[in-house]
Regions:
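The feature marks the mature, well-folded catalytic cores of soluble enzymes
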Residues: 2-418
Length: 418
């Protein structure tokens, strides 16, 4: 049995969405994001195709902010390190190939260096153009590229001192589960949990899982996270003396509502970013239920709530919302489409998000958040700790076209308790 020796001393500990960030997992978008065409982009879960050169420039300052203020781990680096262990390498390659019906590649991949294997597990392994001309022309990759890997939040979620390996709704992302399970089990040495090991029909994704505090999860129920997945989370934490889960139903269309963090994120102890129709139960959210699940001594009670803010009040959160897109519905819909509600907290009251959503940034400014540029923070000209509340904005026109924002692209590993 393999005993991986290069574990880090950093422990998984995330008990809120806003505690000061001490460590984070990122993935720099690579050539995998261009290995699609308009005809098969939908198979990659994209609604458009991206330009890597532009993405590189946009992501540079995004990750630069994190490198300036916290410990950053990169998926590709950790994967390459894990693959240096022969047993782990064999296991990961075997599982990856079995999942995609190409077991015949195992021996060939095992002959390569850890760096090359990591590259092919992420960027894809092509059919031979001469040997498989039809398949090469139709699909090109026998091991599909991990087009969505830079959305590190989706496939895994730090939940307190454990990591939830999310049971993805689409097969194109299954290999991400295998990679994250290996990373968190062997590199970080933490317990991993998986809804599908409890029920094969259960699905969860990280964009739908938000940690309010040590006794509260907020969960989105929609096209990616289903009722069985929520039942698994309730079951997992039902042994605690008291625990609460707030469930917000999400529309299945359009694609911008795939996760809860596309319409709601925590900004501070008493502030949140929200898509206003979710609060008012209008437009796309008409008829979408909000439920407070109260677990007390193993007994479970269900309470219907008017909206998420009311549900949060029941569990001791008196939140003041800042509305994505300001106060005009058309602008709200435009900016929500490009992840205008999707902010990531670096510390209480200090968040990062897209600059392009100008009406949302103006609303934050009016709510007392100083508006900072990622370029200045990344290069050390501005310190977020000089401000009580701030929003770090980074320029992006290409990244939002992939369908996610700052929270989607970050997997927190360790935060201060608050």
């Amino acid at each position: 049995m393999s005993i991986f020796k290069n574990k880090t001393n950093i422990k998984v500990n995330v008990s809120s969405e806003i505690g000061r960030l001490n460590a984070v997992l990122l993935h720099r978008p690579g050539v995998e994001i261009e290995r699609m065409t308009p005809l098969n982009a939908h198979e990659a879960l994209y609604s458009d195709i991206l330009n890597k050169n532009i993405v590189d420039n946009e992501y540079r300052y995004f990750c630069g902010v994190f490198e300036r203020i916290t410990k950053v781990f990169y998926v590709s680096d950790l994967l390459e390190e894990l693959l240096e262990d022969d047993d782990l390498c064999n296991s990961l390659i075997t599982q990856s190939c079995a999942a995609e019906g190409c077991e015949y590649l195992v021996d060939e991949l095992m002959q390569q260096s850890p760096k090359d294997i990591a590259k092919e597990l992420i960027e894809g392994f092509p059919y031979r153009k001469g040997k498989d001309p039809e398949r090469y022309a139709e699909r090109r990759y026998v091991l599909r590229p991990l087009y969505n890997l830079f959305f590190t939040r989706d496939a895994s979620s730090s939940v307190y001192d454990r990591v939830l390996i999310n049971s993805m709704s689409f097969d194109v992302r299954k290999r991400e589960n295998l990679i994250y399970k290996a990373i968190f089990k062997h590199y970080f040495g933490c317990e991993v949990i998986n809804a599908q090991e409890w029920n094969s029909k259960a699905h969860t994704e990280g964009g739908d899982v938000q940690i309010g505090r040590s006794d509260l999860l907020c969960i989105g129920e929609g096209i990616r996270t289903d009722a069985k997945g929520i039942e698994f989370l309730a079951h997992t934490f039902s042994n605690r003396p008291k625990f609460n889960i707030i469930v917000q139903q999400l529309p299945h269309q359009p694609d911008s509502f795939i996760h809860l963090d596309m319409v709601y994120t925590f900004l501070d102890r008493d502030r949140c970013m929200m898509y206003e129709p979710m609060l008012r139960k209008t437009a796309e959210f008409a008829g979408k239920a909000t439920t407070w699940i109260e677990i007390d001594g193993g007994k479970v009670k269900y309470h219907d709530c008017k909206n998420m803010l009311e549900a949060l009040k029941h569990v001791g959160f008196d939140m003041e919302p800042v509305f994505c897109g300001g106060d005009d519905l058309w602008v709200q819909q435009r900016e929500q489409w490009h992840s205008g509600a999707n902010f990531f907290a670096l510390a209480p009251g200090k968040v990062i998000g897209y600059r392009r959503n100008s009406h949302t940034i103006d609303a934050l400014d009016k709510a007392g958040f100083a508006v900072l540029n990622a370029e200045d923070v990344a290069e050390g000209r501005t310190n977020i700790d000089d401000y009580n509340r701030c929003v770090v904005t980074f320029a992006a026109s290409e990244l939002p076209r992939a369908g996610g924002g700052a929270r989607c692209m970050t997997m927190p590993i360790n935060r201060d308790n608050i």
